Amino acid sequence: MLNNRASKIGAILLALFFVLTYLFPLNSRLLWQPDETRYAEISREMVVSGNWIVPHMLDIRYFEKPIAGYWINNISQLIFGHTNFAVRFGSVISILLSALLIYLLARMMWRNRQVAFVASLIYLSMFLVFSVGTYSVLDPMLALWVTASMVCCFWALKATTAKTRILAWITLGLACGMAFMTKGFLALAIPVIVMIPVTLYQKQFTRMLLYGVLAVLSAALISLPWVLAVAKAEPDYWHYFFWVEHIQRFSGDDAQHSSPFWYYIPIILLGVIPWLGLLPGALTSAWKKRRKRPELFFLLCWFVVPFLFFSIAKGKLPTYMLPFMGPLAMLMAKYGVDCARKFKMKALRINGYINIFIGVAAVVAILIIQLVSSKPIYMPYEWSKWVLAIVAFSLWGIIGYLCSTLNGKHWLWAASCSLGVSLCIGQAIPNSSIDGKLPQEFIRQNIDTLNASKYIVSNSVGVGAGLAWELQRSDIYLYERTGELTYGIEYPDSQHRLLKPESFEQWLENARKEGNVSVVITYKDPKKLAQMPRPEELVTNRRMAILTYEKRK
């Protein structure tokens, strides 16, 4: 057990780690397209318009996600203003609250502050958690509500009185309702598919069916006002959201992001870094002790069942695993603390060796690609960036070495392996990535030209959202490609926002009578630019170009 002094020091160090990893770099990093520019602009438009019911992007209906994740981002922008920090803070606060829930659940399970503290530390320092948790997507919000749901599930299973049991199931329903309003119907399935094997194992399946009605009612109670409001405002919303976004995306032959069954295995192995050395022992130990320790079986089901469920699905993304990193953090924390308490330090030392290997391998890979490969990551004038990347991964290896010395005594310092990467990544991104995936810099360099334009056109939805965010205007036109706005742009009041190549010159001629026109084009082949009408001004960064057509009388 931790004494009071050790608890205070641990809390201070954990808070410092959180500030350096999660908060300090937020505003300095440019927004990635299409994800971060998308969520930044959707919430900006909600705040400006006051419409918190129906999501729009570029003033075009956007039905791909429900509303609750946007609400968190909206509140963040209202508090922190028009900043990159505000765009990402919704993800950060969701991960922080998830870590607090993990601490609470670990205390409920083991009544041990040390294990609970280590579980939160491991969770916050996992590669998948901190990389997605400092990135503006909706998965951290989903992870928060799924974690809250699972805490309520365990609370309901352990409740000894009818009053407590009723309260737990009602609270579970509220958390599930928020998960549904963040990501949709699949979020409702997660607690169900986890609880079925758990309640069967603990002979509480009938009780789950009985009290589960309360969860269904409370989930409906919290979500029904928005469900009815969006149906009234946009009658077609639920048709698109259910059939296209769920049925086709999850199981259809044309599912988005289709990947093989084993896709999530390497994602998990990479995602638990810098704690990979603890994973095999934690899983095998939990499986062996599952009969005597039902909480370990609960955590195994929380991870394994959704892992298999999403592996069967055809559409896959790395971020889908985020809600299931919590149980792994708790299993590894329990295993690691038990190993240290029993002086069985082999796994803790191995974890240090793995981090040494990661640091050394990353440094060697950067040097080989940069100095030997015919296609280096960085241009010659970017030498400071790849040196910075080498320093960051060297720090990873050095910390791994410290964790492996003294028989693994300092094994918890593995959490700080990623500090160098987290603090340096924004400054170490090669210009080739900035030019293509981080449009903010190019937009800011040409902000006066863009602000002077009556019409702005882009052939990329992600870049278009970035333009709208930076210029604080949503009337961006789309050229040739509609991407994720394909459904919304088919509405009669939005069709004019799509400009097709065969009619573009005529549209341009008419538009120039009203003012300047700026066309922002993403391209790989310069021949793409030659296909456009000749502009008065052309600015390019080799991946994007701004073609400016001046006003004509």
From Swiss-Prot:
It catalyses: 4-amino-4-deoxy-alpha-L-arabinopyranosyl di-trans,octa-cis-undecaprenyl phosphate + lipid IVA = lipid IIA + di-trans,octa-cis-undecaprenyl phosphate. Its EC number is 2.4.2.43. GO terms for biological process: lipid A biosynthetic process; lipopolysaccharide biosynthetic process; protein O-linked glycosylation; response to iron(III) ion. It is an enzyme of class 2 (transferase). GO terms for molecular function: 4-amino-4-deoxy-L-arabinose transferase activity; mannosyltransferase activity. Pathway: Lipopolysaccharide metabolism; 4-amino-4-deoxy-beta-L-arabinose-lipid A biosynthesis. The keyword Nucleotide-binding does not apply. The chain crosses the membrane at residues 6-26, 85-105, 115-135, 137-157, 178-198, 208-228, 261-281, 295-315, 317-337, 352-372, 386-406, 410-430. The keyword Transmembrane helix applies. It holds the Pfam family PMT. InterPro entries: ArnT_tfrase, Glyco_trans_39/83, LipidA_mod_glycosyltrf_83. It is a multi-pass membrane protein. It is found in: Cell inner membrane. GO terms for cellular component: plasma membrane. It comes from the Bacteria. Keywords: Cell inner membrane, Cell membrane, Glycosyltransferase, Lipid A biosynthesis, Lipid biosynthesis, Lipid metabolism, Lipopolysaccharide biosynthesis, Membrane, Transferase, Transmembrane, Transmembrane helix. Belongs to the glycosyltransferase 83 family. Catalyzes the transfer of the L-Ara4N moiety of the glycolipid undecaprenyl phosphate-alpha-L-Ara4N to lipid A. The modified arabinose is attached to lipid A and is required for resistance to polymyxin and cationic antimicrobial peptides. This is Undecaprenyl phosphate-alpha-4-amino-4-deoxy-L-arabinose arabinosyl transferase 2. It comes from Proteus mirabilis (strain HI4320).
